[in-house]
Structure formats: structure tokens, C-alpha cells
Amino acid sequence: MGLLSRRAALAGCLFAVPAFATARAQQQGLGPDAIRDRLAKLEQKSGGRLGVHILNLANGSRAGHREHERFLLCSTFKALAAAFVLARVDRGEEHLDRRIVFSKQDLVVWSPVTEARIGASGMTIAEFCEAAVTLSDNTAGNFLLQSFGGPAALTAYLRSLGDEVTRLDRIEPALNEHDQLGDLRDTTSAAAMVDTLQKLLFGDALSRSSRAQLAAWLIANKTGDRRLRAGFPTGWLVGDKTGTNGSGSANDIGVAWPPSGGAVIVAAYCRQPERSAQHHDAVLAEVGRIAAQL
């Protein structure tokens, strides 16, 4: 059994019972008001703008900061694109083993997986999903969008889930550009993202096997070790999808499963144009530490 297959099997166990049925007696932690206060202080200390929403499925608590304000999706859209692919597989409209052959002309910047697979046998839809989610391969992300009709089709799928906020308008790499304040293109809010992740990973938007596969890809992500993952305590299982545009936007969305049961869903969007990548990572890691206490 391959590494991702083992992770999919493990992830499947996480959905054996509904999320709220796994609740344990609430451990000593921080209430929503204290969490909001800590997030506000983190933003003030770090500079820039920070949008966060946290949902603890074990106790039903929610907390956030600027959670209804819009931020650029950047590569966090790739988790949603992979989920839409899985929804289409569930409906018999797509097959994970469908193979696409492509050329050098299809490549865009940051394509660590696809650049090595030009010509020959190409890649399967499953491989594009894995590359897009676990290594944020931009060409893979574009092929996922192409597979179901482009950004507008992804937005329509999100609307069908009840997400009236998140929208995708462009493909990689243009979707990372933000022209001016008030530009709604390719944006989401932290609250909208958390609610959508809850439906995808713990609701009935996907079949059980597809929920497990999506979770497995998130758990296998290799780009988020210094972000939310770095803040959650040892022993927690974390799956995430990062997003970065290189000009001040740094994001991370995901879910963390504590050993005691339940799950914590987090979306964190950070806009700090004058700060370094290391600074962004530290801010997002602190969000993980705060989220674990809700």
C-alpha cells in the first residue's frame, strides 16, 4: 500500500462517526472571546491584516478575527478544486485514472511535479490533485480547473454548497494578483472557507471515500510545515493547504484532529506586504497555537 493510500485509510477512520459524536469533555481552554482577543493582539503585533476563523467540532465553539473580510485565495483554491473533482467522480462525471498528456507550453511558474512529466504518458487526474494539493503545483492546479470548465465552474460548485462568498475568476498565476482594495476577484473570507471545509470534510457534500481522499491529500501536504502545523501540539494530526503570492499574502487552511477526538477547522489569511516569508510563517504558526485552545 502506497503512502497516500495508507493516509487515505487513516483519514477514512476519522469519518467513521459524525464529528459532533466524537466530542469529549471539554478540556480547559480559552473561550471564544479570549480567542478573539488573542487574534486581535496578534494582528496588532505582527502588522498588516489578519483574517481568521476557527471552528471546534467537538464543542461547537467558533471564534475569529476579520473573519468576514475578503482576502486573496492564492493557492488555497487548490483544495477546493480537488474537492470539486472528487464530487464529479462521485457523480460519475470524472475518473481519477483519466490521463492527460501535456507539453512544455502548458507549464506555468512553480510546477515542481508537472515539469518532470511533460510528454510521454502525462499524468492522471489523481496525480494532478496530489501535485496541486501537496506541492501546490500551479500547472496541476490549472489542469484541475480545465477538467471541470474553469474558474466559473468552481465558483458555481461552491454556490451549490451554500458558499456565497468564495469566488475564483482567473487561473494560475494571474489569480495571485490583487489590483486594488475592493477587488473581489479570486477572494474568500475565513468564515466562508471554514464552513465550506466543514461541508466537504465532515458533511455530505462528498462520499465517505472522497472525504477520506481529500483529507489524505491535505494530510500529505509538504508546504505547510512552518505554518498552522507548527502551532498545533505534538500528537495532533493536521491536514492543510497553503497559499502565497510573493507580494504580501500568506494563507493556510486546514483541519486538525486532537488525540482526544473531534476536529478543529481553521482558515487563516494574512496580508502583510512589508513583511518577510519567515514573519508570515510565524504569524500563521501562532494562529495554530491559538486555534488549539478553543
Enumerate the predicted regions with their spans.
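Twin-arginine (Tat) signal peptide motif
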Residues: 1-10, 21-24
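Structured C-terminal helix/loop/strand segments within mature extracytoplasmic catalytic/sensor domains
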Residues: 2-4, 14, 27-39, 146-147, ...
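Beta-lactamase-like hydrolase cores
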Residues: 24-72, 290-293
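Mid-domain, small-residue-enriched loop/turn segments at the edges of structured enzyme/sensor domains
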Residues: 49, 142-205
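Soluble periplasmic/extracytoplasmic beta-strand elements of cell-envelope proteins
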Residues: 51-56, 64, 80, 101, ...
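Acidic helix-start/capping segments at beta-turn-to-alpha-helix junctions
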Residues: 57, 97-113, 148-149
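Conserved catalytic neighborhood of penicillin-recognizing serine enzymes
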Residues: 107-143, 151, 186
